[in-house]
Amino acid sequence: IIDMLAYPLMATLVYMFAYTPSIKDVVTNTESNFETSGGFGPNQVSTILGLGIFLFFVKIILNSKNKKMLIINAVFFIIITFRGIVTFSRGGVIAGFLMIVFAVVLLLFYTKSQAKSKIYLVVFMGVVAFVGVWIYSSFQTSGLIDKRYANEDARGREKASKLTGREVLIESEFQMFLDNPIFGVG
């Protein structure tokens, strides 16, 4: 099942690299970026790439039967993490890493002690890979990705809204629900 979910993500990565081979040429601010998302919505692409980050990490731990598959899965994990980060949409990437943390906790809880050493090694290497990908992403975006995750604009000023204005929408939708709890508004 993991492989069946991973194959379309591999095709998505190929398309994204064909659509936008150079990140430096298209990143100009800290907003979500349609160009680095293959021309699609950055939030949706980030979500599916976050799923890919999780899937390839799980493939590294559970489905790497030999060194060749381990290397292939690790390369795809690194590439999909990079492309997920440079969409400038934080939700999918953060969700992918939260799923990894949850999976690692479950694996550590349910595996025997001799298998735990492999999990620790993979987690350590994953952290090293992520730090390397983050540094490369920061270089490719001239530091704008650091500002995006720090909730700053391109000039380094803190943005007024941590949710890019969504809190107003959330508040109004919640108020409409409270005003019309039975029949709704439309």
Where are these regions (language model features)?
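Glycine- and aromatic-enriched periplasmic loops at the membrane-periplasm interface
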Residues: E167-E173, F183-G186
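Alpha-helical transmembrane segments of multi-pass inner-membrane proteins
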Residues: I2-N29, F40-Y110, V133-Y136
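Generic structural signal for secondary-structure transition and capping sites
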Residues: M10, D179-I182
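A membrane-periplasm/extracellular boundary helix in multi-pass inner-membrane enzymes
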Residues: A18-T20, F82, V86-T87, V104-R157, ...
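Juxtamembrane loop-helix boundary motifs flanking transmembrane segments in multi-pass membrane proteins
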Residues: V27-T28, G165, L169
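Luminal/periplasmic active-site loops of membrane-embedded glycosylation enzymes
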Residues: Q44-G50, E152-R166
